[in-house]
Amino acid sequence: MAKQHEHVISIEGLVNRFGPQTVHDGLNLQVRRDEILGIVGGSGTGKSVLLRSILGLHDPNEGRIEVLGKTIRYLEPGPHKQWGVLFQGGALLSGLTVQENVELPIALHSDLPVETRRELAVLKLFMVGLDLTAASKYPNELSGGMNKRASLARALALEPKVLFLDEPTSGLDPISATEFDQLISYLRANLDLTIVMITHDVDSLFGVCDRVAVLVNKGIIVDTPDK
């Protein structure tokens, strides 16, 4: 009997239009538990629109999206504490130290005492390979690779079940990009994460992704990287 996959994200009949332009027309996609799914596509195929739709930050014209069994609706409360997001630019707050950035979602979504929040923030930073020296710095004092890692630590702050990565290796040199890919694989294996990654990095697709979803002809085709 074929193995049954549990889907943590399910998209059915997604339609996104912008004026006369249709970006997605009846798009269907299922993301399996514990997999790393890479999403690729040319300019204008709607990679960012798809991600924003899943996160409830864009209101599709039609379709149904479920994440962790919950229907996602535009700007409505959802299972947000169960997912983490690494935005393309990192989106760290420039006026806070790295540790304070990581601590912020913990402070907003828990009643933990300050000292415990700080300890958890440092733990997340250690998890992504950053030490106490980096923790005390501000985002503009970090290298590009360290900034990505700090942003990833913040995305992991609430111990999510699903992690969304938007161009995680963009702007990194080849060595740093490879190290970041290795970190993603390590975190998936040790934290039981399901990861959805938008990327144009071919090495990432072949190095870490279990399946690749290609946006084409207003829809999507999913297969293993070697196909």
Q: Positions of the model-derived regions?
A:
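Catalytic Walker B motif of ABC-type/P-loop ATPase nucleotide-binding domains
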Residues: 163-166
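ABC ATPase NBD coupling module
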Residues: 71-84, 115
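Conserved ABC ATPase "signature" region
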Residues: 115-133
